């Protein structure tokens, strides 16, 4: 990347995720390269020619063997990305606090060629029991007997946890700078341990939730449901307005947890994650926690 004036700011090239800046001429942006999941997220600074940007990412996709390039933008910017071959795969309501985010994607063949006609649509979603789309009072979620929970905020510990369980959980960091949750619920019942984490963004009042130890059996559903609920309660105390989660579309039990807690699917993302040697579609679940007004100018100015 150095020949293209891209500056690496992550810890090393052997890491599964790199954050890279690119600046050349009037093009200026940052991107998150996730080699484990064969995708790349663009953080665009809204300057430069979109066709040049697209051509640049097409070259990276071929060089890195990527399946997907995507970006998360406001509505007015989505039109520019659509004009150069990106497809809208869904939205994250309230992602920018007062505006929704559109997920714009470009999917590639095994030969690194962009798939013509845009990202292929995923098949029909699996039937998931629960109350998807309905508001649910989180107070009604009962704590399983014998379950003990603790909130963890130690960055080093959270980094170690992701390093240990992240791959099996299909964890994929979504933000810049820190590639692990900054808060997590650690739950214990007997000899079994569970982790649910969140990447928070106080500027925009949202958080991404991940079950780092996803349910493998029906009997684990009440435990994970309570862990997610406890984390949502804590995020609400931090004035988080909304949360979202990315989940493999065929992980029925994990999808059921979000459904039972009143999340609803707002995006279906083709070949968004990689499991073993297989590209897997993902569902994006969203839930609003509170209607938090945009900060007053006086608070921003101190």
Question: Where are the regions a protein language model picked out?
Answer:
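Short amphipathic alpha-helix that is part of the acyltransferase structural core
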Residues: 2-12, 35-46, 118-174, 295-302
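A conserved beta-strand-loop-helix scaffold within acyl/acetyltransferase catalytic domains
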Residues: 17-39, 44-46, 159-217
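Conserved beta-strand-loop-alpha-helix junction that forms the acyl-donor binding cleft
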Residues: 70-78, 245-255, 271-275
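Conserved active-site tyrosine of GNAT-family acetyltransferases
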Residues: 80-81, 257-258, 263
